[in-house]
Every structure is written in C-alpha cells, then in structure tokens.
Amino acid sequence: MVHRVADCGFANAYVVEERHGILVIDPGSRGAADKIESLVTDGLGKSMEEVMFIAATHFHIDHINGLGRLLSRCPPATKVIFHHRVRDYLDGKRKLTPMRNWLSGCLPVAIASLKYVQGIRDISFGISGIPLPLLNGLCRIGFSRQRVTFIGGDGRWRYGFGFGDWEIIETPGHTEDSISFYNSGSGDLVSGDFILGYESCGKGKVARFYWDREVLMRTFVRIRNEIKAANIYPGHGDAIHSPGNALPGVQPLTL
C-alpha cells in the first residue's frame, strides 16, 4: 500500500508498505524525514527497522535532502537506491543536466506546492542537487557510499529490486536519471516528476519542466503503451486515480 506523507514540503514523499518491509520514496527535506518516521512508527504502527529501501526518483534538491537524516534512523541493512547516472554526479564526472522552462514549468509547480510547506524544516535543504550553472556540479551525500545501490545501465528499462512485485522503471526526460516505481499487481505507479498531479481535471499531466522534451515525450508514449496504472502518485500534486488505467487520461506534451 502506498501512503503519501502529509505536508512534507515542496515535493511529495511516499511510504510503501508491504508485508515484508517498507520502501520510502523521495524524502526531500529534513522535515520530510521527521514526518516519514512519524508516519511509519505512529501512523502505521511499524518499526524503522522494517525500512528496507530509501529511494530518490531523481537527484534534485527537493527529492534528496532528507535522505541522510532518514537513513540515520534506519538499520544498517537499509539501502539507498539511485539511478546509475548519480554515480557519475557523485564522482564529479558529470554535472546535473540543465533544465528548461523555469518560468512556465517550474515556477507554477513551486507556487502550488507552497501549501504543503508547514515549517522551516520542510524547506531545510543543503546545496546538493541544484540544477543551476555553478551549482549543478555540487553533488554530495551525507552518508557512506556503501549504503547505495545504483540501478540501470545494462540496457533494460524495468528492474526488480527485491521488494515484492515492485519494479523500478527508467522514465528519463524530466532528468536523465529519472526513475519511477511500479507494481503491476496493484496498479500503483510512483512517478516522481515525470507526471504531475496539478491538472484541474484531476487526470494529471506530463511535466513541463524538463531536461529533454523529446526524451520525455518518448518516455510517456512507452509507459502509456506498455503498463497500466490505476493509481499514479506524482512528485508534486495530488494522486491520480482511474479504474483500470489512469495513464490514457494524463495530459501529454505536444509538439
């Protein structure tokens, strides 16, 4: 079951609860880390010892900056999941990709997300993961690389990772390292910023803030054609639900 963490800052964070353990997706701030712990222990009646994985759908500031704080409260066996491109960011071999449509794509989402910011901890960030010139090479993590699992790079686009029926799906376009999480049995898709939940019709839309428009368009066509997601949990905005499959209703990018 997918649980959205309430009011945890600019980006949505999710706790995925399965019988065998817990997956946390996108702890984007120190406040998000605290609220995730509260949801796990108080809301779900679970132990932080049950957290198997903490994942980032992409290496942007509003999705990664609670990772270290949350990981410090988890058992030594808990792994952090990144796309394989993040290894190059951390090694200084590659910078974060430049982004397009800051005013028309990013600003409206940031403004709409302000209602989820409840305090200073929800905007308590480091400087890592900022896709701006002079800052896009400052990619650091505040924990041991031994805790990290880098996925992808072998030609596949869907990966099992040892968490039941859940798969990681590569969904590049918003960034080159974007990944989503999909469960074909439940029809749940945690999309990161690939799909957003701010469309007034409640059906969602493909992100207008992106690294590569054509790649993003191809990614959406592939996902729409090859999987069915009755429940889409976006990186920003509200969840999108439709019996059977919500993907055909998502507003795509157009040429």
List the model feature ranges, each with a label.
Residues 16, 156-163:
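Short acidic-hydrophobic surface loop/beta-edge motif
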Residues 1-44, 180-197:
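Conserved beta-strand hairpin/beta-sheet module of binuclear metal-dependent hydrolase folds
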Residues 28-31, 139-144, 160-249:
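Metallo-beta-lactamase
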Residues 23-25, 55, 80, 188-190, ...:
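Residue-level marker for buried hydrophobic side chains located in beta-strands
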Residues 39, 66, 70, 216-219, ...:
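A general structural detector for well-ordered alpha-helical segments in enzyme core domains, enriched
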Residues 31-32, 42-149:
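Active-site HxH/HxHxD metal-binding segment of metal-dependent hydrolases
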Residues 148-157:
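Short acidic-hydrophobic, aromatic-tinged amphipathic segments that line or gate anion-handling sites
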Residues 35-36, 66, 245-246:
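Residues at alpha-helix caps and immediate loop-helix transition turns in enzyme cores, especially N-
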